Amino acid sequence: MAAKEVKFGNEARIKMLEGVNILADAVKVTLGPKGRNVVLDKSFGAPTITKDGVSVAREIELEDKFQNMGAQMVKEVASKANDAAGDGTTTATVLAQAIVNEGLKAVAAGMNPMDLKRGIDKAVIAAVAELQVLSQPCADNNAIAQVGTISANSDEKVGRLIAEAMDKVGRDGVITVEDGQGLDDELAVVEGMQFDRGYLSPYFVNKPETGAVELDDPFILLVDKKVSNIREMLPVLEGVAKAGKPLLIVAEDVEGEALATLVVNTMRGIVKVAAVKAPGFGDRRKAMLQDIAMLTGGTVISEEVGMELEKATLEDLGRAKRIVITKENTTIIDGVGDAALIESRVAQIRQQIEETSSDYDREKLQERVAKLAGGVAVIKVGAATEVEMKEKKARVDDALHATRAAVEEGVVAGGGVALVRVAAKLAGLRGDNEDQNVGIKVALRAMEAPLRQIVINAGEEASVIANAVKNGEGNFGYNAYTEQYGDMLAMGILDPTKVTRSALQFASSIAGLMITTECMITELPKKDTPAMPDMGGMGGMGMM
């Protein structure tokens, strides 16, 4: 076991605080409408420019092990806020820094750290309850657009695009962010179910001008295995040919003789066929095939349930109004599935979303719900250069998370005003002893930090504006973008309640633990032992 270095008391806390301040100072320059950018060097490719707090935090690794421990703990605050609400990472970091700095001053003055932490916790619990009281529902598209605009660094176009996307695919719909082709941002809405599998052979293409396969009123054959023998499919193909309808085959794979025969039949015009691979892998593929079956009113031909492809009939096939297949995607429009069955399938998947602990699984399940329930909106981000594209995409992503959080728990006045009002309402809160009272004051004082930092980043005097806001009432605050005082809600400066709540809870949780630290242990750096010297020629060993 490697030797360790141990630091105690004030010496340990000072080192930890230095690390906290280095990371927080780098992150907090990005806060507010006039926050600055941070440039991150990458080991390959161009540097990344970002205004996203968690992206800055993740890049920081300090050489001094004790400082690094402090920095890593604050990094955890930003990461947790990002995971919970998808935004508010910079606010959480600023709050954590303020609580740690004020708290450690109180510890140095002789307060009991455990009582300080209890006081901080008490203040935060009361503050969260007060935030819920101040919260207003995010009712209309205008409010959604305003939340998106604020989170995207006052970019109104992004706010409007997100509101439009939510309007089209519903509050639960999937909205994805992709690289655009031009300079302008665009919104594309995919109606029906789309999955990322294209045609298996370019010979299926019947619209050469668009390079796509379009099938009107087709049958859909769903097979949960590889198909390589055409004889298995002959009964189905004959039935489809008699009906005079096109056919889409969705299978694990279609290869060899089977694919060749389908291509020949299509080219000769005997039967209009297209084949695609089933989306997903393993169990997820089975589930997605079932989703398509529900949507189209078909049955998955699976040997697991004793069904054979040779015995499949037209009754087992799904139907849809139209299918469009490109090189990369397949879109099924207007499946004829039973609406009640689709609804119960959606409810079943939503239940799985509640139960899963994996973020990846949750995301995939939500995509399945959207595909069954309402379609998918794609925001295509336009920019002049790749560096700008990355920065803008990160902002749009943040704005998207913020609007979802706003729809979920409502909104409060933005610009740090909500926390200032909460702190004012809790001025009379008391703990069980004097040290807890100091802890409460530490937390309440820290709640002013986001407002102060927004003002500092706007180049104004923080104390003057903070006092003016504190003397106001309700939603009265300072708009750093226009440099005017007024009603924050009327000016469209809103923060999602969930974002503000999460930032405060995670910041106080980690900061409280740091205040109660008395000892820090880290590995000593390994000393490089000098290499053994060359032995050289040994005397008396000359060649005979």
From Swiss-Prot:
Catalytic activity: ATP + H2O + a folded polypeptide = ADP + phosphate + an unfolded polypeptide
Binding site for ATP: 30-33, 51, 87-91, 415, 495
Signal sequence extent: none
PROSITE patterns: CHAPERONINS_CPN60
GO biological process, one term: protein refolding
Main location: cytoplasm
UniProt keyword terms in alphabetical order: ATP-binding, Chaperone, Cytoplasm, Isomerase, Nucleotide-binding
GO molecular function: ATP binding; ATP-dependent protein folding chaperone; isomerase activity; unfolded protein binding
Superkingdom field: Bacteria
Keyword Cytoplasm (UniProt): yes
CDD domains linked to this entry: GroEL
Record flagged with keyword Manganese: no
Subcellular localization(s) per the UniProt record: Cytoplasm
EC code(s) of this entry: 5.6.1.7
Pfam families: Cpn60_TCP1
InterPro entries given in the database record: Chaperonin_Cpn60_CS, Cpn60/GroEL, Cpn60/GroEL/TCP-1, GroEL-like_apical_dom_sf, GROEL-like_equatorial_sf, TCP-1-like_intermed_sf
One cellular component (GO) term of this entry: cytoplasm
The protein's role, per its UniProt record: Together with its co-chaperonin GroES, plays an essential role in assisting protein folding. The GroEL-GroES system forms a nano-cage that allows encapsulation of the non-native substrate proteins and provides a physical environment optimized to promote and accelerate protein folding.
Family: Belongs to the chaperonin (HSP60) family.
Record text on subunit structure and interactions: Forms a cylinder of 14 subunits composed of two heptameric rings stacked back-to-back. Interacts with the co-chaperonin GroES.
Name the record gives this protein: Chaperonin GroEL
Name of the coding gene: groEL
